[in-house]
Amino acid sequence: MAKEKFERTKPHCNIGTIGHVDHGKTTLTAAITMTLAKSGGATAKKYDEIDAAPEEKARGITINTAHVEYETANRHYAHVDCPGHADYVKNMITGAAQMDGAILVVSAADGPMPQTREHILLARQVGVPALVVFMNKVDMVDDEELLELVEMEVRELLSSYQFPGDDIPITKGSALAAVEGRDPQIGEEKILELMASVDAYIPQPERPVDMPFLMPVEDVFSISGRGTVVTGRVERGIVKVGEEVEIVGIRPVQKTTCTGVEMFRKLLDQGQAGDNVGVLLRGTKREDVERGQVLCKPGSITPHTKFVAEAYILTKEEGGRHTPFFTNYRPQFYFRTTDVTGIIKLREGVEMIMPGDNAELDVELITPIAMEEKLRFAIREGGRTVGAGVVAKIVE
């Protein structure tokens, strides 16, 4: 059977559900698919189908990330049901990176809880651009004033983590009512209202091809009589023959010119996001470029050594360390295509970091790397991964 062609008629956006355990993230995800299925915008998925991650059945905790897709009149969405449990913060640090926006689910009966706060903080740290709120289980609260109090509390919490708490749309409803097909005024109608706010409030992400050119260097060759060729996969933007590019990271920034782009042994006049290409550089010597640097549009990215990271440290069971680490720990940081040694300083009042913890770390690399906020990395010791992280803030 031929594969269905993916109709790319609508703009695409990646979103997810976040929030405290048992506040209704997975039920809401099911409710969205069921509601949109009525207009042909989704395949209805039951709670059990979304929650079907093998580890999770024993403890009722979603561990693995479930993926569903659906569309509204305006956009096509890929939706991840993010794990709510504190242990699974790692999905946010490593994977929920794929979120252009998120739906924060808060139970009206409980109000914000510790993981609500933690997920908002993580969304801020890992750079989720926008949040909308679904206040769930409103049928469990009789008092209108209580609902208003919870709403105020949620808005204040969002503001305290630098999200625009006053402006964020909050939809109040019951995901379960929508799933069970009852009380449309708090069920189905509210799901449609929520999706309208997601459509309107979560900005359309810029397409990789429209961003400034960047290509991590994987390999370097010299071709006699032609010069130096660097190969890699273009991460974003477009590089055209004749354009100036910069080589950033590890050593002082160098400027050069792209004199040729080659893909599958064919010469092209440009390479764009997603292409595996060889880029010919004018007047650059083989020894001037190395793996771990990036080619980029001049001025679009700068080299840095000091940054604040949000990191998750793997447990022993996940193949990580068996023991905690302390301040001045010196692992390797794997950025894009290379390892760089860095020194970790723990925050004041933090004695040590245990396997399974997530924490804010101050890092100083021994050589500069082309860096920007939201850049992901692995923490490694002797080639094995012991942690995952994201650049939350560049210091210098």
Curated annotation (Swiss-Prot):
Residues 136-139 are annotated as: G4. Mg(2+) binds at residue 26. The keyword Metal-binding applies. It catalyses: GTP + H2O = GDP + phosphate + H(+). It is found in: Cytoplasm. GTP binds at residues 19-26, 81-85, 136-139. Residues 10-206 form the tr-type G domain. Transmembrane segments: none annotated. Gene3D superfamilies: P-loop containing nucleotide triphosphate hydrolases (3.40.50.300), Translation factors (2.40.30.10). Pfam families: GTP_EFTU, GTP_EFTU_D2, GTP_EFTU_D3. Residues 174-176 are annotated as: G5. GO terms for molecular function: GTP binding; GTPase activity; guanosine tetraphosphate binding; translation elongation factor activity. The keyword Magnesium applies. It comes from the Bacteria. GO terms for cellular component: cytosol. Its main location: cytoplasm. Residues 19-26 are annotated as: G1. Residues 60-64 are annotated as: G2. NCBIfam families: EF-Tu, PRK00049.1, PRK12735.1, PRK12736.1, small_GTP. This is Elongation factor Tu. It comes from Caulobacter vibrioides (strain ATCC 19089 / CIP 103742 / CB 15).
